Each structure stands twice: as C-alpha cells, then as structure tokens.
C-alpha cells in the first residue's frame, strides 16, 4: 500500500474490497436438553464438547506395526523452496479466503511479490532444523451447517478448521514435495481417486460402472463392499502415519517438520 504509483482512489478501492471480503456468520439459537441457548459463549462450549467427543484418536502409547522399509525408494529427508514457488502458491490462494487472524487471500495476493523472498528464507531455515512452529498448528474452529437436520441441533453442524495463512503456505510446500515423491516412486496405487491432479471420484465411479457392466455381460456375480470412516480426518493415528511415512523412505528433517 506504500506504492505511491497507485492513486489514492485506487488504494481506497482496494481497501473497500478487502473490507467487503470480511464476512462473519452466526449460529442460530441451539436447543440443548430442551433448553434454548442463545449465549454465544455457551453455544461455543456446546460445540467444543460435541466436536471433541467425535474426534478421539488412538492412545499415543499404541505401537504401530513394524513395517519393512522400501529400499527401492530414494530417501526424502530434506527440502528447499524459492520465492518463485512461494509466489505461485500465494497466487493460488482464494481471494475470498480469510485466515483466523483476519488476513484475506486478496491482501496476501496484493503483497505476494515483496513477501515471497522473506517467506522462502524463513521456510528454508525451518526446513533445515526440522521445525513446524507451534503457533502455526493452532486453528480456530467454526461450526458449519451441514444443510441437513435442524439448525437448532448441534449434530447438524460440522467443524471447519481455520489456520493461519503462513501455516497453509508452509504446508503447501511440504505437500508438493511429498506428493511428487509418492507419484515418482509409484507409492500411491493407480486405483486412488481424488486428491490427485487430473483425477477425481468421477473417474472411480466410471471404473465401477464399467466393471459392473462388463461382468454382467458375461454373467458373472458382482459383489462390492463400501466403507465409510466417520470423521476420518479427525481421527488420524499419528504414530501409524509416521510408520507409513518411514516405510516409503520419508525421514530426516522432512519428517520432523
């Protein structure tokens, strides 16, 4: 905003757009034990207890299985980033996205060039020591209506974590390296659908339909088992996940980060 080549009118226009993107939503009164709750703090505590009860994870003392390492896969133990990569990641942040500290995606996009250099230096120093700042792990949880059920019931809402912008950019760098490592070394099965570029659950659905029709044509019996893991992302067994990462040769400061 200190760029004086931008007119005052243009600066004011940018500020208005930034303010316009700051949208806040409220949860209607909740009914708990036949009592209508309107106090925001009490509603927050109700959601906190409910979401926490649905996100239990295995004990940290549970020992993961002893998995043999894949010696044919090269080790992924360090990484570096660059201002160009950071700027690219920032450009992909949705402009309407707001972090819990109130920084919008639009604002980050506007200052992407001057901050990319400093950000890449910071990230590279963190990668060298294998450290992920504790403050970046703290998320603000907001309750989002599922579009099903009574709006007065806590069970009709799901939790959404709003992380700091720096945390999300840092995670994006790690994700790109880990995904590339898995793809280049055929770690991910070709039956995986979604979470991959150029693939989606639509492809998986087409595969299932094709398999069913092909077997019908030759009078074969078709059987399928569908599993739905409730709150899967909230119940990640971290010790088991680390064991799996070790198995595919992810270690060193990359794993520590």
Regions found by a protein language model. Give the residues of each.
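Short, glycine/acidic-rich hinge or "gate" loops at secondary-structure transitions
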Residues: 1-6, 186-195
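Generic structural signal for well-ordered alpha-helical scaffold segments
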Residues: 11, 16-17, 179, 209-214
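Acidic/histidine metal-binding catalytic segments
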Residues: 251-257
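Conserved catalytic palm subdomain of right-hand nucleotidyl-transferase polymerases, strongest
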Residues: 94-103, 152-162, 203-246
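Surface-exposed loop/turn segments and immediately adjacent short secondary-structure elements
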Residues: 9-155, 161, 165-169, 185, ...
